[in-house]
Each structure stands twice: as structure tokens, then as C-alpha cells.
């Protein structure tokens, strides 16, 4: 169970996302119900993943999964990689509104992030951004040796990456969560 303040933050986040989405098309979510489902989807892996203190979310878009995770885990530090200006501006706005002092936005592509500035992370997340193998190849240098990837993928994940073991995945409805230790890559 999360503290009451988290639910207030989720509501503010959802309202702001829908407001911005009307103008800037940040996400496919068009109702508060779909935003709340996306929030639940973002938080679901907290049930079974190892605890973490640092996380990079690649292709943060409208804030899923990073903003809900940052709200739920205020003791962890989050770096959001989002190169598109309208989305990085939205993320910066919501961080200020919610006073998420544990989050920073980097308006840059993952290919251009300097390793000297971002490294030794516990967790890297991404939701439906690119092919899993390509994403892992581009970002594994940022993980610590005991770090993990948590990729939020759709049902095409199995076609996208047939060599990746299904034992490394867990599912909920049409979502596949790929959770992999960096030493096993």
C-alpha cells in the first residue's frame, strides 16, 4: 500500500497529462481511466523486482513508467531520457508541480548520453521504445554490474526477440515485462 500523497500525485499527474495531451499529443491515453491503467501498469513490477536506488528511463514520453515509479519510490533517483522537446517540457513541468526532487530530465537521445555523467545505475526501464536487443546494446554501459533491465513490452516482444527466454518475462494481460540481470546478458 502506498502513502496517501502518492494517490494525490497520481491524480495531479493524470489531470496534467490529459490537459497537455489535448494540445501536444504526448500519449495514447485519452481518459483518466486509461491514465490510471497506465499508472497501474507502471507500478505492477514493483511487486517482484529487486529494490533499487537509481533508475534511468529511456524514451520517457508522457511519463510512463518513470513518473509513477518516482512517485512511489521517492528515495530512489530517476533520470528520464526524452529527446523530444514537447515531451521533455511536460516532464519537467510535472516534476516541478509534484516537487519530485528525485527526478531529472535529460532532453537527449540515449545514443548521446555521456557515460561519464550517467553510470553505475541499478535499473534501466523503457516502455515500447525500440527493439529490446538494440535498447540493451545502447544502454548496458550505464548499468552497474549488479544492475537490471526492466522493459515494458507488448505482445510483439516474442517476434521482436525470439532468442530471449520467456523465463525472463512475466505477463499481465497484454503486457510483457522483461526483467533481466546485467550479468546474464
Curated annotation (Swiss-Prot):
This protein's record includes keyword Cytoplasm: yes
Give yes or no: UniProt keyword rRNA processing.
Answer: yes
Q: What is this protein called?
A: Ribosomal RNA small subunit methyltransferase G
E.C. designation(s): 2.1.1.170
Instruction: Give the source species.
Output: Helicobacter hepaticus (strain ATCC 51449 / 3B1)
Catalytic activity field:
guanosine(527) in 16S rRNA + S-adenosyl-L-methionine = N(7)-methylguanosine(527) in 16S rRNA + S-adenosyl-L-homocysteine
Superkingdom is Bacteria
InterPro entries the UniProt entry points to? rRNA_ssu_MeTfrase_G, SAM-dependent_MTases_sf
Which gene specifies this protein's sequence?
Answer: rsmG
Cellular component, GO, one term: cytosol
Amino acid at each position: 500500500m502506498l502513502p496517501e500523497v502518492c494517490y494525490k500525485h497520481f491524480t495531479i499527474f493524470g489531470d496534467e497529462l490529459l490537459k497537455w495531451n489535448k494540445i501536444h499529443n504526448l500519449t495514447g491515453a485519452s481518459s483518466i481511466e486509461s491514465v490510471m491503467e497506465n499508472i497501474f501498469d507502471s507500478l505492477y513490477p514493483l511487486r517482484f523486482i529487486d529494490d533499487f536506488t537509481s533508475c534511468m528511463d529511456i524514451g520517457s514520453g508522457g511519463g510512463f513508467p518513470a513518473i509513477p515509479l518516482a512517485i512511489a519510490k521517492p528515495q530512489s533517483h530517476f533520470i528520464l531520457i526524452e529527446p523530444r522537446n514537447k515531451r521533455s517540457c511536460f516532464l519537467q513541468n510535472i516534476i516541478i508541480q509534484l516537487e519530485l526532487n528525485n527526478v531529472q530530465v535529460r532532453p537527449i537521445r540515449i545514443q548521446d548520453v555521456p557515460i561519464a555523467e550517467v553510470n553505475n545505475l541499478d535499473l534501466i526501464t523503457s516502455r515500447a521504445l525500440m527493439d529490446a536487443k538494440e535498447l540493451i546494446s545502447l544502454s548496458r554501459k550505464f548499468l552497474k554490474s549488479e544492475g537490471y533491465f526492466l522493459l515494458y513490452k507488448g505482445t510483439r516482444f516474442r517476434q521482436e526477440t525470439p532468442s530471449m527466454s520467456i523465463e525472463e518475462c512475466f505477463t499481465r494481460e497484454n503486457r510483457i515485462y522483461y526483467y533481466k540481470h546485467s550479468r546474464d546478458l
